[in-house]
A protein has these predicted regions:
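Short, solvent-exposed loop/turn segments at conserved positions within beta-propeller repeat blades
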Residues: 103-104, 146-150, 200-202, 252-256
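Asp-box/BNR beta-propeller loop motif
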Residues: 22-36, 59-79, 105-124, 153-172, ...
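Bacterial Sec-dependent N-terminal signal peptides
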Residues: 1-29
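Repeated scaffold domains used in trafficking and secretory/extracellular systems
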Residues: 41-43, 84-89, 126-133, 229-234, ...
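Blade-level signature of beta-propeller repeat domains, shared across WD40, Kelch, NHL, RCC1
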Residues: 327-347
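Short glycine-/Asp-/Thr-/Trp-enriched loop segments that recur within the blades
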Residues: 36, 80-84, 124-129, 172-182, ...
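Beta-strand-rich domains and repeat architectures in extracellular enzymes and scaffolds
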Residues: 33-59
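Entry beta-strands of beta-propeller and related beta-repeat scaffolds
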Residues: 51-53, 95-98, 138-142, 194-196, ...
């Protein structure tokens, strides 16, 4: 009995003495930059340190499989006349590649090695799709600005073979002037079957579904809202409860008032953080993997900022302008911007 008690005591002491994760202090970073001529890139999918896919303007779809040493870039054209401007890109768990264009007509491509197939097309004077993601191998979602009095949301449940637009009677109503921002393909966040979408304009709100996008709730936020290009540009969730939203006013990028907030209850309520402090306007925010929700990067045309306390305080680590960032592990991330891709390697 004494031996058993001793073993239990040793195990408890060992467990309690395990080193807790200590967030890093990062004051500057180095990014390896790859020039991409004649395309502005707001949508990327990073597989690992070596493999990345991007979708950009002027129909550009690009890939690297050797960490950026070489690139394969193709440019798509519809009916030999329409050049799609891509701002949405998604990969399902079976590695199906999908790219969605903004503007009229909206063109959603399934892109293979030797062919490109349009699996969804929508024509409307107001059509404008902003971002797209997959939950898993079968279920996917894309969101766009209202063509009626509700957001445009299309869903797939067959690996992207077919897409269906939800009717307005199944969606929350939008205020006049409320829409989404196609800035970084990150105004959607997904954890398991739950999806959150962030809006801006006259209202800055969070839409939430816990059933692959079939039914919806909507919540208010204290993020700046009103006239013009202000609101939430990007969201990310570390788990089903803890998330962060960031944005601001694109027309006043140096303002840092009411442009970042966190939630601890799955998006129902939001609290402003770092009020009247950096960072200012940002188009993308992402948690660093395996850092217990403490380390966060935010990027935009105003530079790159880092937080090691869950978003409460920030440090500007670079003035380089980028639209979006995506981590593949605790130390490696890919970024994209105007005519460039970046690769960040942390120590």
């Amino acid at each position: 009995m004494k031996r058993i008690l001793l073993l239990i005591l040793v195990a408890l002491i060992s467990f309690s003495c395990k080193k807790k994760y200590q967030p890093r202090t990062i004051e500057s970073i180095k990014i390896t930059e790859f020039k991409m001529d004649s395309t502005s890139i707001r949508a990327i999918h990073a597989f690992n340190k070596n493999k990345l896919v991007f979708a950009g303007s002027k129909g550009a779809i690009g890939t690297t499989e050797d960490g950026g040493k070489s690139w394969n870039i193709k440019r798509l054209k519809h009916n030999d006349s329409i050049i799609p401007n891509f701002r949405s890109l998604a990969i399902n768990e079976n590695n199906g590649l999908f790219a969605l264009s903004i503007g009229n007509p909206a063109l959603l491509y399934n892109i293979g090695l030797n062919k490109e197939e349009i699996v969804y097309k929508e024509e409307h004077e107001k059509v404008f799709y902003d971002s797209m993601h997959f939950f898993d191998a079968e279920h996917g979602i894309a969101v766009g600005d209202p063509t009626d009095d509700c957001p445009s949301i299309i869903l797939t449940s067959d690996e992207g073979k077919t897409w269906t637009k939800l009717p307005c009677n199944q969606l929350p109503k939008f205020e006049e002037g409320e829409a989404f921002f196609a800035a970084s393909n990150t105004n959607i966040a997904i954890v398991n079957k739950t999806v959150w979408i962030a809006s801006g304009g006259t209202k800055a709100r969070i839409l939430k579904s816990t059933d692959y996008g079939k039914s919806w709730e909507i919540y208010n936020t204290p993020i700046i809202q009103g006239d013009g290009p202000q609101g939430i540009y990007s969201i990310d969730f570390y788990d089903e409860n803890n998330g962060i939203a960031i944005g601001g006013n694109y027309a006043k990028p140096n303002d840092n008032c009411a442009n970042k907030a966190i939630t601890k209850d799955g998006g129902k309520t939001w609290t402003l953080v770092a009020e009247n402090q950096s960072p200012n306007y940002k188009s993308c925010v992402q948690y660093v993997p395996n850092t217990n929700g403490k380390e966060i990067f935010a990027v935009g045309k105003t530079g790159i900022s880092f937080s090691n306390d869950g978003g409460n305080s920030w440090t500007e680590v670079s003035k380089d302008p980028y639209y979006t960032i995506q981590f593949v592990d605790q130390n490696t991330a890919w970024l994209s911007g105007h005519e460039k891709i970046g690769k960040l390697s942390l120590p």
